């Protein structure tokens, strides 16, 4: 388009093409639970200690929670999670703890998990899954409270939350 000579409809059409091209480059987030492929290595989680071992390098990794677990106030995880975490309907209880992860990264999926308890040991708003969600949260529930509690996370940043519900009390945060 020539500067100053394009009609509004031409500008709108060019803007739509550009927007469509940008959207095509973005990775689509799943909106239904992710099935773990045959033949891949799955890490089974049965304790809080095993959760603490999930640090970096989670991209393409699969984690399955085999029973309910409790994370206490001394639990800290500084990981951006980019794997698949399947709670299989189990509950992660937070007892004055930080969230399960620092944040859910763009390729991270957390599914089929219930979160309950209290957020503590934090200095800013956070949720059961940390500060932000860029990936997907599917078939999950959260029921938390605390001075800085924010439901699943402080913010949804291009991520998807589907078939999930959030309850709780928070004097400072949003409960999504």
Where do the PLM segments sit?
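Beta-rich interaction/scaffold domains
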Residues: 1-38
């Amino acid at each position: 388009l020539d500067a100053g000579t394009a009609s509004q409809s031409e500008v709108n059409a060019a803007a739509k093409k550009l927007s469509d091209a940008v959207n095509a480059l973005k990775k689509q987030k799943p909106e239904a639970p992710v099935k773990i492929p045959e033949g891949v290595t799955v890490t089974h989680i049965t304790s809080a200690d095993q959760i603490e071992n999930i640090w970096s390098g989670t991209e393409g990794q699969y984690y399955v929670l085999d029973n309910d677990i409790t994370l206490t106030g001394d639990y800290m995880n500084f990981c951006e999670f980019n794997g698949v975490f399947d709670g299989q309907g189990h509950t992660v209880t937070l007892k004055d703890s930080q969230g399960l992860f620092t944040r859910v990264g763009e390729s991270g999926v957390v599914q089929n998990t219930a979160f309950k308890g209290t957020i503590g040991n934090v200095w800013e708003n956070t949720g059961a899954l940390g500060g932000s969600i860029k990936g997907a949260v599917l078939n999950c529930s959260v029921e938390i409270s605390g001075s800085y509690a924010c439901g699943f996370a402080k913010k949804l940043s291009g991520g998807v939350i589907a078939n999930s519900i959030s309850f709780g009390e928070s004097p400072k945060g949003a409960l999504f």
